[in-house]
Amino acid sequence: MKRTFQPSKIRRARKHGFRSRMATKNGRRVLAARRRKGRKVLTVA
């Protein structure tokens, strides 16, 4: 059986990157929560 995690930088950025977070209301909520928590890194991209 193959491993399920087959990393791809493009796919990672498109799904979880800053611009995709900013594109939706809930994504912006995620960023706000991470800022409030004081995360040094907000997104993967």
Curated annotation (Swiss-Prot):
Record keywords, A-Z: Ribonucleoprotein, Ribosomal protein
GO biological process terms, semicolon-separated: translation
Pfam families: Ribosomal_L34
GO molecular function: structural constituent of ribosome
GO CC annotation, single: ribonucleoprotein complex
InterPro entries found in the cross-reference section: Ribosomal_bL34, Ribosomal_bL34_CS
The protein's name in its UniProt record: Large ribosomal subunit protein bL34
Annotated organism of origin: Streptococcus suis (strain 98HAH33)
